[in-house]
Amino acid sequence: NSKLKTQNSKFLHEPNASIMKAGCFDELAAAYGVSPVSRNSHLFLSAEPVDGFPGRSFSIERVTTLNKRELRQALAGIEKANIATRNFPLSVAELRKRLKLKDGGDVYIFATTTAEDEHLLLISHKYQ
């Protein structure tokens, strides 16, 4: 079972382009009290919503591995989603094909690799 699943993270934060270019991820984590998913993912987690975060925030509905049975359960009822990959071995197109999902809708799936080298999908909705 993933450490990510058990650390009570309910919100995912994606920094905006200026933060990504500046690369000040440690400062961002300290200033907003968020934790990085891993060193190279540039996605951050928190247990509570973060006001004023410079980027987009999402509420995490489910976290799943690429295990077929787990995926089938996690994606039940989802026909389309916005997919982003960060530090992940598959491209968005490859992942979309594998998940058999159309583009769009209000579901956001972030595919990433944790610090423990575990490949995870974070299934979420935009927060506010």
Where are these regions (language model features)?
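SAM-dependent transferase fold signal centered on methyltransferase-like domains
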Residues: 1-128
